[in-house]
Amino acid sequence: MTDILAVAREQVLVRGEGLDQDQTLQVLQLPDDRLDDLLALAHEVRMAWCGPDVEVEGIISLKTGGCPEDCHFCSQSGLFASPVRSAWLDIPSLVEAAKQTAKTGATEFCIVAAVRGPDERLLAQVAAGIEAIRNEVDIQIACSLGMLTQDQVERLSEMGVHRYNHNLETARSFFTNVVTTHSWEERWDTLQMVREAGMEVCCGGILGMGETLEQRAEFAANLAELDPHEVPLNFLNPRPGTPFGDLEVLPASEALKAVAAFRLALPRTMLRFAGGREITLGDLGAKQGILGGINAVIVGNYLTTLGRPAEADLQLLDDLQMPIKALNATL
């Protein structure tokens, strides 16, 4: 049997063609003693097809908690006995968060809300927030506001939203084990409308929710079909009071194999370290990930969990001589 890393070197590194679902599964099934070779190849692919720059992003929760959906990993669902309570962020605080994010060298600031989809009040708050940020901060603005209608997509585009995040979360075949209050197809439809409106598509998910390696490979293939600009990779950080609160944290070696496998399946895509990497990988794993296919990071804290200090990530990038991607858009 031909070694999958030899195949990947020719197919992905040389020709720039991502691995298919079966090939990605073979990568995920590699023994731990092949991990270093796998990470080295994924890093070569990232450097060849994406370059050395790392995009830095900050995120902020405009509306926290009280969500009517039942995403089993999420402490912001109003259906679970989690400690997160519903709250709104005021515009001055939103602007200050954008300023602090820009000071890290970040080029992207994502406004997030825990909702099924935005209502008029939320859209008005987003519009006011974007206008206020643009008046004071030189940064690109992304949004993550749940599922959208065609009208809402167009309005966000008109507001100047640069990129829209809506995660598929997991493989299509596993989705009903994670969410029952809406469908995978509804999420997919929103992403297609976002693309058609000219916004960049940001779509990833969470690894370690009980999916099989086969489903992890399926998820990579789902994303390859979607072909988003960016894929954020989260690792489950089990939240008390949620249906997934008692799941085990993904082993670090398994998480790193997934990072590298997704890079080999998506050679030209921005692959971002997102939530859960602190408890799954720790400091050493963060370095291995950035040298194993990752080319974007979220700095600072996440929506309901603490992240690594921004200074730690920025120092790591400096130590590794990875330049931070510069802001080059006209805002």
UniProtKB/Swiss-Prot annotation:
Q: Which NCBIfam families match?
A: bioB
Pathway listed for it is: Cofactor biosynthesis; biotin biosynthesis; biotin from 7,8-diaminononanoate: step 2/2
Positions of transmembrane segments: none
* The UniProt record lists the keyword Secreted: no
Q: GO annotations under biological process?
A: biotin biosynthetic process
The reaction(s) annotated as catalysed by this protein in its Swiss-Prot or TrEMBL entry are: (4R,5S)-dethiobiotin + (sulfur carrier)-SH + 2 reduced [2Fe-2S]-[ferredoxin] + 2 S-adenosyl-L-methionine = (sulfur carrier)-H + biotin + 2 5'-deoxyadenosine + 2 L-methionine + 2 oxidized [2Fe-2S]-[ferredoxin]
Lineage top rank: taxon = Bacteria
Q: Which residues form the Radical SAM core domain?
A: 52-277
Enzyme class name: transferase
Enumerate the HAMAP family for this protein.
BioB (MF_01694)
User: Which cofactors, if any, are listed as required?
Assistant: [4Fe-4S] cluster; [2Fe-2S] cluster
Q: Binding residues for [2Fe-2S] cluster, per the UniProt record?
A: C110, C143, C202, R272
Q: Which UniProt keywords apply?
A: 2Fe-2S, 4Fe-4S, Biotin biosynthesis, Iron, Iron-sulfur, Metal-binding, S-adenosyl-L-methionine, Transferase
> What does the protein in this record do?
Catalyzes the conversion of dethiobiotin (DTB) to biotin by the insertion of a sulfur atom into dethiobiotin via a radical-based mechanism.
Q: What is this protein called?
A: Biotin synthase
Molecular function terms from GO: 2 iron, 2 sulfur cluster binding; 4 iron, 4 sulfur cluster binding; biotin synthase activity; iron ion binding
EC number(s) per entry? 2.8.1.6
This chain's source organism reads Mycolicibacterium vanbaalenii (strain DSM 7251 / JCM 13017 / BCRC 16820 / KCTC 9966 / NRRL B-24157 / PYR-1)
Q: Recite the UniProt cofactor note for this protein.
A: Binds 1 [4Fe-4S] cluster. The cluster is coordinated with 3 cysteines and an exchangeable S-adenosyl-L-methionine.
Subunit info here reads:
Homodimer.
| Amino acids binding [4Fe-4S] cluster | C67, C71, C74
> Which InterPro entries did the record assign?
Aldolase_TIM (IPR013785), BATS_dom (IPR010722), Biotin_synth/BioAB (IPR002684), Biotin_synthase (IPR024177), Elp3/MiaA/NifB-like_rSAM (IPR006638), rSAM (IPR007197)
Q: Which Gene3D superfamilies match?
A: Aldolase class I
Q: Can you tell me which family this protein belongs to? A: Belongs to the radical SAM superfamily. Biotin synthase family.
PANTHER family found in the cross-reference section: BIOTIN SYNTHASE (PTHR22976), BIOTIN SYNTHASE, MITOCHONDRIAL (PTHR22976:SF2)
Give the encoding gene's name. Answer: bioB
